Amino acid sequence: MRSTGRSHGPRRFLALIALPLALAVSTPGLASPSTDNAVAPDRSSTGEQNGVGLMRIVVADKSGIDRLNQLGVDLAEYTKPVDNGIEVHAILSPEESQALRDKGFDVQDAISDQGDYAQNMAERAAAIRAATATTAATDTLTVLRAEWFTSLDNQLFLNIEVKSSAGTDSTTVLTASWDGGPGTEIGSGGTATMSRFTDAGQYMYHRFSNPVPITAAPVKATITSNKGGSATVDVAKWLGSPRKNPGKHPYVSDFVDHYMDPTEVTARFTGLAAEFPRLTELIDLPYKTNGYRRQAQAQFGTAAASTVYVTSTAYGSEGGNDITVSLVNPGTTNAPLTVSVSGKAVTVRLATDGSGAITSTAAQVVAAVNGNADAAKLLTASTYRGNAGTGVVAAAPVTMLTDNLKAPASVSREPFQMKVLRIGKHRDGSKVGVFLYCQEHAREWVTPLVCVESAERLLRNYAKDPNTRKIVDDLDIFILPVVNPDGAHYSMYDYNMQRRNMTNYCPTSNADPGRRNAWGVDINRNFSVGSVFDGYVGASATSCTSDTFAGPNELSEPEARNEVWLVDHFPNIKLSMNTHSYGGYFMWPPGAYKAEGREVLPRVDQGTEAYFWTSSDYILSRVQEYRGTAIWPGRTGPVTDVLYSAAGNSADEHWYNRGIIGWDFEVGADIYNPATGRFSAVGFQPPFAEGHEEAMEFANGNIAILEVARAYATDKIQPKTSLKVVKQEVGATGFTFSTSEPANVYYTLDGSRPTYSSPKLALAGMREGVQNITVNSDTTVNWFSIDIAGNVESNYKPDGQGSNYNKQRVAVQ
């Protein structure tokens, strides 16, 4: 993948706010300089007055999301279809919210992530435009999914997804009706209009905006179109039954009781390694992070043209916080502008005219400070956000520089040593490896708890729980609890909505202390597959203050390189799970597309897609068994199908470069309120009581992933297939294959021996079943299948000379 050098193009969206307004926000700190130099950041924590909020935005379609990304808006990894478009969530200050409204965006109410949840935006009834029945062509309906499921408090829901052959016409309206259970009529259970889902201007399929609450599990559903099409299908149950009681030995769980910072999490893992040396080892990853540290700064001035800020050469923790700067009025006439240094005290004596008035401009002060060799060893001076600096500066008292960091002394200011806890009885590379990793995004406080809880359960249940013992004995498990430790510390103690790491690539025009909450690289946009540097959507390569800033080039960040090092150094890793929040998603590759023509990264083949879906049913059933949370079918699937494009994400990196089967959790499913009939989002940092429950249920999911991995590792059963004729008419016969388990089918139609180079059974389309193959004359079909674990049907050797493949003649009338 190509990389580019350091780039400092258009500034982040917040820079679009008028400069005088930005200065007005920080005026109190500028007008009254003090020894603590309290400069208000442009973006303050949610809990502060005029701080950022988690805001709803409704856009018409995915192109609106792409535009928000291009503007550098800080979007949550959350989307929800609504009747008039797509709802997304963004971290915005009041000024940023208004600036987006001025640009025509529908910025709506705030979602509290501190416990007081706002209701979801009101759904308006779908307007069905009448179509002339006599002129409308009858469309064909393909039902993609029809399922019912239960969630919290045993509330039942219905999910249906249908593709219409006339779906590209925005006037196509689909209506679903269902029965009320066995022996009841279609329609007795309810009727609902479906929403038309488009992405990047292309029709995808129709679905419900939200799963529909129902009172009884339906058996069948009928979908009708205003274009004349109709289809009736069976409604299946989504997710399985509860796990059986493990036996007389109680399964122990619940090992987290508060949100933990990365220092605490690492100490917990270090303690586990010491307590269980026979089953674990700690791996020090090779690339230390930049660390929870910043240069110290001070800012002087009340207007853009006369403002100067200084930045220490050393980090604040390494002496930068000991530097002082003063701007002195000499009190004499015709004084020259001079700079002097005594120890770590920098004194700027401002120039005056014949009347004794100060004449030094901001640009002149900057040049004088930077031109003084002794001062330049300590700090650099800059004008405010690229201003020419023609305004006259004001005198200021001795001011101490500060790095503005608030974490306690227990949080080191040195580069952070990331550690992986390796768990397994046999840690020699002979067992299938599974990589579980959490908190790529700093503000997602629940996610490291999922990794901690998973590790604790594996080790503390090993002695007495047979299922846990099988997992640990048969797998090689790698758990990285915090991918982004610097950003996570910053989120915990300085700015709760920090998403990125703390590395500042901004030029001086965006490096003043007011910008300090807008620096860093999005780790989950810094990988090398499907990246913004290759033209994919969902990250910024030019705005260093964008919350999806991908960095100066692919894999520029040590956090991302550590992930790559781990999976390269341990090639036995075959499966992975990346835990994020929020929204209740379960996803897999592909995760990115190019905007032009919605060019998606290559989709996985049908055998792998079937494996993802089959595994999902098992994994999500384990999530559900904790307290009833059901991950919606509409939030399950490839990232590009159910969320949006996320250029340069880690799951794509590991799948396309190494073939690692990887999933993404988004913990924190929306909570249904039966009193209001609405779903409420939980946010990044819910009250701990809710965060605890999310950690418990998704730790269940992690254990289930390990069970799936063990089944993969121990699978010696060969798949079985059969050829099924699905359609016969004069001159043509359509057929497909059915398999006993997720498997790829290779076939020939010319009588030749099938090999891995032969045509492979494909999917009929996005979220559809397998394709139908049509022949126009009597044809001998030869085929074999291979499952995900590599077992070949009938022990056939595709690269050999044997003939023990399947054969069947398909007749044509």
Task: Identify the function of each model-found stretch.
Residues 342-349:
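Strand-loop-strand motifs at the edges of beta-sheets in extracellular beta-sandwich domains
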Residues 32-309, 315-320, 349-736, 755-780, ...:
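M14 metallocarboxypeptidase catalytic domain recognition
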Residues 314-341, 370-375:
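Ser/Thr/Gly-rich low-complexity blocks that favor extended beta-strand/coil architectures
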Residues 739-741:
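Short glycine/proline-centered coil/turn motifs in the loop regions
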Residues 2-34:
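Secretory targeting and sorting signals
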